[in-house]
């Protein structure tokens, strides 16, 4: 089935493509445009976010018309009394949707309309069917009773001649009425469809027609027998009689109307808000007869009073307000009021009942409600989980003493603080669970694939062996002896600084067996690499130098292997040296749980010498025996490849080169793969010797070309059916990693520390850009540098890291952020050095990792603000006080220790107590001459400025602040 495109989904959901793209981005999906295709799970999520619509709005009109279709329409037997005014504007729109009238009725309506102005007096007792002669305009309708109160439901047609002829407004034509439409005809003829637009019906002569009063509670035709001739309940209305409205033969207020045939009775009613009765145009006030409508000046009557209830005929209905039309459109009732949905009512109730924190209402949990959040989530993500307003969560967080924005990535500690306040248990999804959920969204379940593999599809695979140990214990040289190569000669400083993967063949018991070796660094900075090597291996070979013994990295490698639950083979190296002691090594490793077989344990120890090529075959035999005896190594070759990226680097001619280890399946040239945030199609594969490989089977390490970027060492890779799927997985992984990094870098600023940070100024920060030859070395260097701690005054921040030569973009970034570029086994590209010199960017290059660590640590210490300490200069005893009107009190003193310096800091001590601190020696004289300093054993005169509280026997101590060297 073809995958849907964004614009197709937008059309299906009744939204624009821009809204669909925006919603997909909110859901974490990245699409390039409206023509991009999306996966079925993504389309399902979008359909859930936007329920399919498009028919709901048009369906409202037929629903509104439904009651009117079953009501009998009046027969247009007579004309409207004398209506000659300009055509009504609203009628033109309705006429287009009205049915054509009968051919025989149209001439009658036209003839009746022409005779209407000739009428001079109302015709009493004339039947509606014979209403060709109508009353003259302006004739008072004093004897006409008011139509009775409306009752819901269909009404019977009034009998002909039941009402006296009286000029009355036509129902359903009031522009201010809440509902428009015609009621039943007086002739009793039933009409199944809407009233023809070109036909006019005759009104009841001599009586005002209902449905035309803008102040009436109910609009529409009323039953003819509901209130004929009888007095209105409650007595006549005050205000005097009212003559027939002058607008009966002319235009009515609000919407001018001509004597043209009425149109559009079956069409939709005019929309727009209903005006207030107080805004209606004024009407002539006169004495109204019994049963007539009240004058506007008398004011509308509220429901519950006389004339307000059903049957009262006038005023407002008992339920108050202008109501819906009864009679003309079936069942009537009170005015149409917008009813809130149950969901809206529930949300309002929750908001009203939610406790207020910091002045805002936020939904609270019961203390056991679990909320799962991804790494680097923001307050918007948390608000979406608990159905709250993100701005309210910002207010709550400020109330708790934390400052953050709605879209800022927060760490787990901040979410735990917020969750504890609101009654939620926050669970931040681990990277493994996040990766599994990401793949499941693309219908990729690695665990289910492993469980579905049967014995018939499994095939034996070679063991993967990781060589681990302390630095300079001979791991790489041992591999050189196994492979008959000289890899160690190419290592800087003689130490391995990246992972190497090789596959060799050896003959064991007459059979050729393949073994895959992974060489890991032994330096302490490469802890992550050793842990990564232990995770992908089947057997660990622990190399220990016989002359050096067990070292810290030996114990660390041992712990990594035991944590990964892999069997260990110990290779005691350098046994050819005179001071070698293999038995000592066996005894030391026994303390860590590795008991040799000769001591009754289950760990194989082999004494080897990589330099002398001693016992290499015995070591290979031990590896194969361990694999056959303790492990059952099988994999499925007939499926999409799965594996791990061992190492990656950026080659100048070939681009991103990634060394991958296939764990299951078969990787072929042309497959679409994704490794971490890198994706692409396999263009070529090479083995460790540089030979071309067409297909890589399980446990085979190969170099892959064709990835978009350089993945990180340790990223898992998998082959997909389509490159589009690989790209989407990579983009989601990149977004998740970016959010996690932002949350990790966020410096928590509390309200208490905010003022202090502003007062102290910005904290000194050393920005670094790290470029290396391989991604594993860059990762190790970054981790080691971030562990340097010289105090809170100076911070280290890595603003960019990458693989490959230093480019102009790196220099430009360093210029903007005042950063230092560190190159690890790389050199700058062409003309980059000149640009760096011109911009004043410092670049440092290293080939050994611990040299870079030492220099960066020294630079950080140099950025520390100096510390000062108080150093005592000397003391002087006051032996006599000289009082001067010009200079104040002068102390005649004898220097007992050190020296007294002019303008130095001083304090006055009396009987062992400090009388005054932070004094300054303003004047210092030796006899009558000014002196800069006076040393021990001499007398002098000391003036302490404006401080005159000195006595004989007081001690003057002088001191100064000196910079203290930082450790």
From Swiss-Prot:
Region entry G2, spans: 494-498
Compositional bias segments (type: Low complexity): 51-96, 103-154, 197-206
Ranges for domain tr-type G: 460-632
The keyword Nucleotide-binding is assigned to this record: yes
HAMAP family linked: IF_2_B (MF_00100_B)
Biased composition (Basic residues): 334-345
Organism (species): Kocuria rhizophila (strain ATCC 9341 / DSM 348 / NBRC 103217 / DC2201)
UniProt-annotated stretches for the region Disordered: 34-363
Name by which UniProt lists this protein: Translation initiation factor IF-2
InterPro entries named among the record's database cross-references: EF-G-like_DII, IF2_II, IF2_N, P-loop_NTPase, Small_GTP-bd, T_Tr_GTP-bd_dom, TF_IF2_bacterial-like, TIF_IF2
Gly residues bias (residue ranges): 184-196, 300-333
């Amino acid at each position: 089935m073809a995958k849907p495109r964004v614009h197709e989904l937008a059309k299906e959901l009744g939204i624009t493509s821009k809204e669909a793209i925006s919603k997909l981005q909110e859901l974490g999906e990245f699409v390039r445009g409206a023509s991009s295709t999306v996966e079925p799970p993504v389309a399902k999520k979008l359909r859930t976010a936007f329920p399919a619509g498009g028919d709901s709005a048009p369906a409202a009109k037929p629903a509104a018309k439904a009651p009117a279709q079953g009501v009998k329409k009046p027969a247009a037997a007579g004309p409207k009394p004398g209506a000659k005014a300009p055509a009504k504007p609203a009628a033109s729109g309705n006429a287009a949707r009205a049915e054509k009238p009968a051919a025989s009725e149209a001439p009658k309506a036209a003839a009746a309309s022409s005779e209407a102005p000739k009428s001079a007096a109302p015709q009493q007792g004339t039947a509606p069917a014979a209403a060709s002669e109508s009353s003259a305009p302006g004739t008072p309708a004093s004897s006409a009773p008011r139509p009775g109160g409306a009752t819901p439901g269909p009404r019977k047609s009034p009998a002909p001649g039941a009402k006296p002829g009286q000029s009355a407004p036509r129902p359903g034509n009031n522009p201010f009425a809440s509902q428009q439409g015609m009621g039943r005809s007086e002739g009793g003829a039933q009409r199944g469809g809407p009233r023809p637009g070109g036909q006019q019906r005759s009104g009841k002569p001599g009586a005002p027609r209902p449905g035309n009063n803008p102040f009436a509670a109910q609009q529409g035709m009323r039953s003819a027998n509901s209130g004929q001739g009888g007095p209105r309940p409650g007595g006549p209305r005050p205000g005097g009689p009212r003559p027939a409205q002058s607008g009966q033969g002319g235009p009515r207020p609000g919407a001018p109307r001509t004597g043209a045939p009425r149109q559009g009775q079956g069409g939709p009613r005019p929309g727009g808000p209903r005006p207030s009765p107080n805004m209606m145009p004024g009407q002539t006030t006169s004495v109204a007869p019994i049963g007539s409508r009240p004058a506007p000046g008398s004011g509308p009557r509220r429901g519950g009073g006389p004339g307000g209830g059903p049957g009262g005929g006038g005023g407002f209905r008992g339920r108050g307000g202008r109501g819906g039309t009864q009679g003309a459109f079936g069942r009537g009732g009170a005015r149409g009021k917008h009813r809130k949905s149950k969901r809206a009512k529930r949300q309002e109730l929750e908001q009203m009942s939610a406790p207020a924190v910091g002045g805002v209402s936020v939904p609270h949990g019961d203390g056991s409600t679990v909320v799962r959040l991804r790494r680097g989530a923001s307050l918007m993500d948390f608000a979406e989980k608990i159905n709250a307003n993100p701005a309210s969560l910002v207010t709550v967080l400020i109330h708790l003493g934390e400052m953050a924005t709605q879209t800022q990535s927060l760490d787990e500690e901040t979410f735990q603080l917020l969750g504890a306040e609101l009654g939620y248990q926050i669970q931040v999804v681990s990277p493994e669970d996040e990766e599994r959920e990401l793949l499941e969204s693309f219908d990729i379940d690695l665990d289910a694939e492993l469980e579905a593999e049967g014995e018939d599809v499994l095939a034996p695979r070679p063991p993967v062996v990781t060589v681990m140990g302390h630095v300079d214990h001979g791991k790489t040289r041992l591999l050189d002896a196994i492979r008959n190569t000289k890899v160690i000669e190419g290592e800087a400083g003689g130490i391995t600084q990246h992972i190497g993967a090789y596959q060799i063949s050896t003959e064991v018991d007459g059979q050729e067996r393949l073994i895959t070796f992974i060489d890991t660094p032994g330096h302490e900075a490469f802890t992550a690499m050793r842990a990564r090597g232990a995770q992908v291996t089947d057997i660990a070979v622990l190399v220990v130098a016989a002359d050096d013994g067990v070292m810290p990295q030996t114990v660390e490698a041992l712990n990594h292997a035991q944590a990964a639950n892999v069997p260990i083979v110990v290779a005691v190296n350098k046994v050819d040296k005179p001071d070698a002691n293999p038995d000592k090594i066996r005894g030391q490793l026994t303390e860590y749980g590795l008991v040799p077989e000769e001591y009754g344990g289950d760990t194989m120890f082999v004494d080897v010498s990589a330099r002398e090529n001693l016992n290499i075959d015995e070591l290979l035999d031990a590896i194969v025996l361990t694999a056959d005896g303790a492990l059952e190594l099988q994999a499925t070759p007939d499926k999409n490849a799965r594996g791990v990226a061992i190492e990656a680097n950026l080659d100048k001619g070939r681009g991103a080169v990634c060394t991958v280890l296939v764990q299951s399946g078969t990787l072929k040239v042309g497959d679409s793969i994704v490794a971490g945030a890198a994706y692409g199609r396999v263009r070529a594969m090479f083995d460790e010797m540089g030979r071309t490989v067409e297909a890589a089977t399980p446990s085979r390490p190969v170099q892959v070309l064709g990835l978009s970027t350089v993945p990180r060492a340790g990223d898992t890779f998998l082959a997909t059916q389509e490159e589009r799927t690989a790209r989407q997985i990579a983009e989601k992984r990149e977004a998740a990693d970016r959010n996690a990094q932002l949350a990790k870098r966020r410096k928590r600023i509390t309200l208490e520390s905010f003022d202090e940070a502003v007062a102290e100024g910005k904290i000194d920060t050393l920005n670094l850009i790290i470029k290396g030859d391989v991604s594993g070395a860059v990762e190790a260097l970054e981790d080691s540098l971030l562990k340097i701690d010289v105090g809170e005054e100076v911070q280290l921040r890595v603003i960019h890291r990458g693989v490959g030569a230093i480019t102009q973009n790196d220099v430009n970034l360093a210029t903007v952020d005042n950063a230092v570029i560190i190159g690890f086994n790389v050199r700058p590209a062409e003309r980059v050095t000149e640009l760096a010199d011109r911009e004043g960017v410092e670049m440092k290059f290293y080939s050994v990792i611990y040299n870079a660590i030492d220099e960066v640590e020294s630079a950080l210490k140099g950025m520390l603000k100096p510390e000062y300490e108080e150093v005592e200069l000397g003391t002087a005893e006051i032996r006599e006080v000289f009082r001067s009107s010009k200079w104040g009190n002068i102390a005649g003193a004898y220097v007992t220790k050190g020296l007294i310096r002019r303008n130095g800091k001083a304090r006055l001590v009396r009987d062992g107590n400090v009388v005054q601190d932070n004094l300054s020696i303003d004047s210092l004289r030796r006899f009558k001459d000014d002196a800069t300093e006076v040393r021990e054993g001499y007398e002098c005169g000391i003036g302490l400025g404006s401080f005159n509280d000195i006595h004989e026997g007081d001690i003057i101590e002088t001191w100064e602040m000196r910079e203290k060297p930082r450790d």
